[in-house]
Structure formats: structure tokens, C-alpha cells
């Protein structure tokens, strides 16, 4: 048995800061406030790898390591006495061993995390099995466990502020981490027909969530709405994904995929502070069907034409009262967003390439049609494609 060790250490330091001012006019009164958000994150870690010619019954790779992550965030809204300071520290150790040959692979591993907002160490196991009955068939089964730690800051607070609502989040005394368990089974098929080659992936997935995070309004303090983050029973997401790819030489390539899923809570939950609003079991902003496709055509080497599209099925979205009289759950229409891009490459000098491109985003202008306006609008009532039909042109240099 031979052991080939590899030691890797890395450190990444990043900082980000943003400051901006909003002006709100409510009932003829002009209210100006400033808000500053700063976030500083740094990560360091090391990794150690052993490669075994044979570990018990077949060759294997062992990976182990340590990681430390710290994030310091402050969010200060001047004039509203809303100041949030959140410090997150995560110390982690991870390990896995993968036995593999051409036909089989078995992976067993886990991760230990100590989060400063959780009073115990969290163990997250994972396992993966691969079997290749033939060279053109790949079968996989995998299991993983994950968690999301409590946090008091939520970017949605900024969205609400745009609409004139000022709120803060407090953590419930008995709040615990949100946990997930995921299982997936897939089959990957490859085939070649003369100048054509294709690939088909079929995957079924099931994710079970427990102690799901939720928010409820518990009061008001100095004009600021106080929301409490607490744990609900749980939820599940399950479905099927189909993906395919076919290519003809280097001339034409088509790739497409579709996912059909169900995402729902174990029990119907109250999402509105108005007790007369019906509870919902279905997860908001999770369509039952969504998909994509990309078609690339290379009529000659320097030129590429790409047609792409995304489909988003109907989903349920919250529309809060203000502009409307009462909170309602809206079933959105489905959207198909089609894009076209053409590019031409010019070889400038010794490996330096310049590409000139142009195209159209969202050709059919599939876009939300019921935007609301005014001081009482729900600023979070936004769904669908991010922009209407738009035209673009660009230049890219590659070295």
C-alpha cells in the first residue's frame, strides 16, 4: 500500500460595504432616511489528501480538512433607531473517503460545524454510490444532511424598507437550526450515432426539511415592527428532473432540461398577520414546473449564434395589503423568456481574441403586468423575469 499525501492551505479575505439614501413620500410628507450596511467576511482553511493504491478492497482517496469562517455585518438605518449587528463564526472539520474503480465508487464522509448561534456541534453526514454497468451508463444514489443556522438579519428587510415599512427580526428563545435531509437517484446515459452524440439524465430527488424557519409579527417598538423568527413543523420538496444534450459535430448543439416538483409544508401555515386570510400549505415562489434550453450554432469557426430560453411555471406569491385592501395569495401566470445572441471572434495578436456580440433579451417581452405603484404598494410583490425586452451589444477581450 502506498500513500501519496497532498497538503493544501488557503485563505480568502473579502470585504464589502454599501451606503445609500432613500426618499419616501407618504401622504404628502417627504421623509428622507439614510441606511448603511457593511459586511466583512474572511475564510481560512487547510486540506489534506491521501491516495491509496488499495484501502481494504479497492483504491481510495481520503480527504480531511479544517475551515474557519467569520462574518461581521452591521446594518444601520439612521433616523429610525434601527441598528443590527450580527457576528457569525463557524469552525468546521470535514472528512471523506472515496473508494473507486472504473465500475464502482463508494463515498462516505461527514462534516462537523460549531456555529456561534447554535449551542451544540452539528454533524452532517453524506454518502454516494456510483455504478457503471456499461461504459455508456452511469447510475448514482446519494444522501446528504445539511443545516441553516439562525440569523437576525434578512435582506428582505431592505426590500420592505423601499415600501416604507421599517422592521426588525428577533430570534425566539427556543429557536434551533433548520435541518435538511436529501436523497437523490439518477441515471446518466451516453450514446453516439455517427456524427451525432447525445446524453440523457434522469434524476429523482426528495428533500425533507425539519424545524423550518418562519416569521411572525409580535409587536411594535418606537414605530418599528418587530418580527420573531421561530421554528415550524417542517416541509418537503420532491420531484423529477430530465436533462438531455445532443450535438452534431462542432456545428450544432442543443441542451434542454425540465424539472417537475412539489414543495409543500407538512401543515398549512399562517403567512399573514390577518387571521381571516386562509393558511397555505404550498411553498411560495416555488413553481411546480420549470425548465431551460440552449441552442448553439457555429456556421463557421469565428462565429457563434446562440438561442436560449427559460420556462417558469405558475407559482404562488404573497401580495400584502396597502395598495390592496387585504393580503392575498396570487397564482402568477407562467413565463417563457427567449434570448438571442450572435458573436464573432477576431484574432488580434498572438492568442489575443476580441469578440463582438449583440442580441436581444426576452424577445417575447414576457414580463410581470400587474406592478403596483404608490406609497402604499407592497415592494416585495415582484415575480417573473428580471427585465423586459432589451437589446444589447458588447465587446470581449480574451488573453
Where in the sequence are the language-model features?
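Face-selective signature of the C-terminal outer-membrane beta-barrel domain
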Residues: 1, 9-17, 30-119, 198-204, ...
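Residues that define the transmembrane beta-barrel architecture of outer-membrane proteins
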Residues: 38-42, 87-91, 121-123, 179-183, ...
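Gram-negative outer-membrane beta-barrel transporters
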Residues: 100-105, 204-208, 228-320
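Transmembrane beta-barrel strands of outer-membrane/channel proteins
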Residues: 12-16, 64-70, 108-112, 127, ...
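Outer-membrane beta-barrel strand-turn architecture
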Residues: 50-56, 98-103, 123, 131-135, ...
Amino acid at each position: 500500500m502506498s500513500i501519496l499525501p497532498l497538503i493544501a492551505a488557503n485563505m480568502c479575505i473579502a470585504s464589502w460595504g454599501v451606503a445609500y439614501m432613500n426618499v419616501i413620500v407618504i401622504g404628502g410628507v417627504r421623509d428622507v432616511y439614510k441606511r448603511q450596511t457593511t459586511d466583512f467576511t474572511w475564510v481560512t482553511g487547510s486540506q489534506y489528501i491521501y491516495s491509496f493504491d488499495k484501502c481494504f478492497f479497492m483504491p481510495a482517496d481520503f480527504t480531511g480538512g479544517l475551515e474557519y469562517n467569520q462574518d461581521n455585518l452591521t446594518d444601520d438605518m439612521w433616523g429610525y433607531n434601527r441598528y443590527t449587528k450580527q457576528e457569525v463564526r463557524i469552525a468546521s472539520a470535514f472528512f471523506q473517503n472515496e473508494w473507486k474503480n472504473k465500475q464502482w465508487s463508494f463515498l462516505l464522509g461527514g462534516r462537523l460545524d460549531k456555529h456561534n448561534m447554535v449551542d451544540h456541534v452539528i454533524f452532517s453526514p453524506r454518502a454516494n454510490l456510483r455504478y457503471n454497468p456499461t461504459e455508456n451508463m452511469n447510475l448514482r444514489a446519494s444522501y446528504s444532511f445539511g443545516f441553516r443556522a439562525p440569523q437576525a438579519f434578512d435582506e428582505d428587510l431592505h426590500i420592505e424598507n423601499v415600501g416604507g415599512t421599517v422592521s426588525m427580526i428577533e430570534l425566539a428563545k427556543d429557536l434551533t437550526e433548520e435541518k435538511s435531509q436529501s436523497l437523490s437517484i439518477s441515471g446518466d446515459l451516453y450514446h453516439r450515432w455517427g456524427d451525432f452524440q447525445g446524453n440523457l439524465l434522469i434524476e429523482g430527488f426528495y428533500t425533507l426539511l425539519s424545524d423550518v424557519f418562519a416569521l411572525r409579527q409580535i409587536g411594535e417598538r418606537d414605530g418599528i415592527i418587530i418580527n420573531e423568527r421561530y421554528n415550524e413543523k417542517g416541509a418537503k420538496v420532491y420531484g423529477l428532473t430530465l436533462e438531455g444534450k445532443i450535438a452534431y459535430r462542432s456545428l450544432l448543439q442543443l441542451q434542454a432540461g425540465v424539472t417537475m416538483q412539489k414543495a409543500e409544508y407538512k401543515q398549512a401555515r399562517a403567512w399573514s398577520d390577518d387571521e381571516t386570510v386562509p393558511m397555505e400549505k404550498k411553498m411560495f415562489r416555488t413553481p411546480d414546473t420549470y425548465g431551460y434550453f440552449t441552442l448553439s450554432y457555429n456556421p463557421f469557426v469565428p462565429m457563434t449564434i446562440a438561442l436560449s430560453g427559460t420556462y417558469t411555471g405558475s407559482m404562488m406569491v404573497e401580495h400584502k395589503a396597502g395598495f390592496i385592501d387585504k393580503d392575498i395569495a396570487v397564482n402568477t401566470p407562467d413565463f417563457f423568456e427567449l434570448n438571442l445572441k450572435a458573436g464573432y471572434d477576431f484574432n488580434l495578436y498572438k492568442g489575443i481574441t476580441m469578440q463582438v456580440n449583440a442580441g436581444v433579451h426576452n424577445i417575447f417581452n414576457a414580463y410581470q403586468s400587474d406592478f403596483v405603484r404608490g406609497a402604499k404598494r407592497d415592494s416585495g410583490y415582484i415575480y417573473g423575469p428580471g427585465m423586459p425586452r432589451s437589446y444589447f451589444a458588447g465587446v470581449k477581450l480574451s488573453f
